[in-house]
Amino acid sequence: FKTGLVGFLLFGVISLNAVAEVRLLEGWTRSPPPGVDRLAIYGRLVNDGDTPVVLSRLELAGAGQVMLHETVMDAGQMRMRHIDPIELSPSKALVMAPQGLHLMVMGLARSPQAGETLTIKATTRLDEVHTFLVRVQPITALGPVPN
């Protein structure tokens, strides 16, 4: 019995330590113009774990979809390309910035205003859930406001 209990406890500790910590650093967005139901989120997605993490689902309450997009030049036109799945290597950052990678939020039920904080829920292929906080900046913002 003691051996089984010790094994169970060790397995539980090992399992807890195996969960990767995925964070969004300096997450920010601009308040969208009136009548626009979408916005782009920027920042650095970081996997602090020892193994790769694949994000399979992103959600924001009151929005239809959240997806990773890349802005690319195609035949002289700037276009957004959907990237799926979102793979995060250990100890590396996925940098999201204007005119590059970004989380695209579409189908907003209402426009968030400057000063609000949005919460993105990210689910991995292993059903681990991470939450990311995103600060809403004025429409004229060029980057995140320091804390």
Please state what every model-predicted region is.
Residues 21-147:
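Compact, glycine-rich, soluble single-domain proteins
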Residues 13-15, 19:
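N-terminal signal peptide c-region/cleavage motif recognized by signal peptidases
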Residues 1-8:
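Bacterial N-terminal signal peptides that target proteins for export
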Residues 1, 19-22:
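Absolute protein N-terminus
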